[in-house]
Amino acid sequence: MLNFEKGYQANLKAMEYEKNKDIEKAIEFYEKAISYNFDGNYPYDRLTILYRKRKDYNNEIRVLNKAIKVFSSIKSDRCDINPKLEKFKQRLLKAQTLKNKQ
């Protein structure tokens, strides 16, 4: 199975766990999805939101840095890449600001 497919399947499982309010399992599977350098934004978005709710800024920053790395490396004509990259960069600045306020 290709890494994209593994990431996609992990993302689907995470979504199901989150839907069923099993946040710990959802985080586990979103983390698994991004470990495969999955290039869909959903697991990165959800992890940053879940970590922000916990005020776990270190993990939020780690996930955002990973997202920026993954989306910066995509060599494609996809028109959604730059807006996503900008969104991740803005969120990273906000997370760093919040962390520094602790």
For the regions a language model picked out, list residue spans one by one.
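Structural register within alpha-helical repeat arrays
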Residues: K6, K13, R46-L47, A67, ...
